[in-house]
């Protein structure tokens, strides 16, 4: 019996490995200098009509037929070797021994770390806990179909809640150590409101009502001249998935206006809970802050001109200040080119806005990245500074002192 050999991949397009270098061959055809790669399986199948194949070669002499078959065998062998090389290369890059490998979606092209609240939550948590980690943007979902997920010492964990529990057990970190039993209960209740209710209203605004803007932010590498088409297809597939899952959840059965009313109630609840505190549960960070920030950041920076953006930057300004404090403290490479304000000037046009791409560190550690800079001797008071000259958005502003000072005026 004669056999045929081929390459089968579970995805029809290549994926961007970002800084994870790999053999680049699709880039040669697409004219791109970025590294691309794909992974799949070598499959073998029986040739039922080998005689027909030989007859299909026509009246070529036997030596040509032999050359054709030999060439096919060499191509199959080359495909197999390439596959094995890619697998070995991938395993070398993803060595999770004593290292946290964070799998998440590719960075969007608007300067925001992620369009996924849960990916942003997880990466922010790792920075808050000062845990070095390695990003991997392969696009592969976990065994449960979840994103993000991590690998640590060859163990794979998905679901942000289970990931955090896993890291607390393995590495002894605990952002909630300053919370009492009552505060822990409140924190969990707020987490469920944000992740199981507020999230769906954001998803509706992001992937249904504001789909065209989201499509512009989506980053798809490897599409070459078909990037726009692929982006359109991915966004509309995601839109259908979100609408179907929202309907199953129940919130998708309401009208658009009712969904936005529910969103506003959640945002007002968060604003009321935060008040004038530095963080949601008080002066100290907790896991809840990573959760809330991951979701509110979508309203702040990924939904331009929408109702949640107007609300958070207008009436609920304490939420905007809260987001800015966390962004500046834990994301020094995010929007570092326009730190003076969170608002666009009235004179700026849509075409004049530029976004700095996110810089990704091989192994990120906050202690190696953040260094306190010496304070300047003089300062000028602006509407965005407190009585000490600090920006109201800075992470080290003492909100209690600021409030007391304002009340004494």
UniProtKB/Swiss-Prot annotation:
Membrane-topology annotation of the record: Single-pass membrane protein
Start and end residues of each stretch annotated as Disordered = 372-409
For this record, the Gene Ontology CC terms, alphabetical, are: cytoplasm; membrane
**InterPro entries according to UniProt:** FAX/IsoI-like, FAXC_N, Glutathione-S-Trfase_C_sf, Glutathione_S-Trfase, Metaxin_GST, Mito_Protein_Transport_Metaxin, Thioredoxin-like_fold, Thioredoxin-like_sf
Question: Keyword set for this entry?
Answer: Membrane, Transmembrane, Transmembrane helix
Give the Pfam families listed for this entry: FAXC_N (PF19333), GST_C_6 (PF17171), GST_N_4 (PF17172)
State the superkingdom.
Eukaryota
- Where can this protein be found? Membrane
Its transmembrane ranges are 68-88
Q: What does this protein do?
A: May play a role in axonal development.
Task: Please report which protein family the annotation says this sequence is part of.
Answer: Belongs to the FAX family.
What's the protein called, per UniProt?
Answer: Failed axon connections homolog
The organism is Rattus norvegicus
Gene designation per UniProt: Faxc
């Amino acid at each position: 019996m004669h056999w045929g050999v081929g390459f089968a991949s579970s995805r029809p397009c290549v994926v961007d490995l970002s800084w994870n270098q790999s053999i680049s061959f699709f880039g040669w055809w697409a004219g791109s200098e970025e590294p691309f790669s794909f992974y799949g399986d070598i499959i073998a199948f029986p040739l039922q009509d080998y005689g027909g194949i030989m007859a299909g070669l026509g009246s070529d002499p036997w030596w040509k037929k032999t050359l054709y078959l030999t060439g096919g065998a060499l191509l199959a062998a080359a495909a197999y070797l390439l596959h094995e090389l890619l697998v070995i290369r991938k395993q070398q890059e993803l060595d999770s021994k004593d290292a946290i490998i964070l799998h998440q979606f590719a960075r969007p092209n608007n300067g925001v770390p992620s369009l996924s609240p849960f990916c942003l939550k997880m990466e922010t948590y790792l920075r808050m806990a000062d845990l070095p980690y390695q990003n991997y943007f392969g696009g592969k979902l976990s065994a449960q179909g979840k994103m993000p997920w991590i690998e640590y010492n060859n163990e794979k964990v998905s679901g942000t809640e289970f990931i955090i529990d896993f890291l607390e057990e393995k590495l002894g970190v605990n952002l909630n150590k300053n919370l009492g039993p009552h505060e822990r209960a409140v924190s969990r209740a707020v987490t469920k409101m944000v992740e199981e209710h507020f999230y769906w209203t954001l998803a509706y605004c992001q992937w249904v009502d504001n789909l065209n803007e989201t499509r512009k932010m989506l980053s798809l590498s490897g599409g070459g001249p078909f990037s726009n088409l692929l982006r359109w297809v991915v966004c509309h597939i995601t839109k259908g998935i979100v609408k179907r899952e929202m309907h199953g959840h129940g919130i998708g059965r309401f009208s658009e206006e009712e969904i936005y009313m529910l969103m506003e109630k959640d945002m007002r609840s968060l604003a009321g809970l935060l008040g004038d505190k530095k963080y949601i549960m008080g002066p100290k960070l907790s896991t809840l802050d990573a959760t809330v920030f991951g979701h509110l950041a979508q309203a702040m920076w990924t939904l331009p001109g929408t109702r949640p953006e107007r609300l958070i930057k207008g009436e609920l300004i304490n939420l905007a200040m809260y987001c800015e404090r966390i962004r500046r403290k834990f994301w020094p490479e995010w929007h570092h080119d326009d730190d003076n304000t969170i608002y666009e000037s009235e004179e700026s046009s849509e075409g004049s806005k530029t976004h700095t791409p996110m810089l990704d560190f091989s192994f990120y550690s906050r202690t190696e990245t953040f260094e306190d800079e010496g304070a300047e001797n003089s300062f000028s008071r602006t509407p965005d500074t407190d009585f000490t000259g600090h920006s109201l958005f800075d992470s080290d502003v003492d909100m209690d002192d600021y409030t007391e000072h304002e009340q004494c005026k």
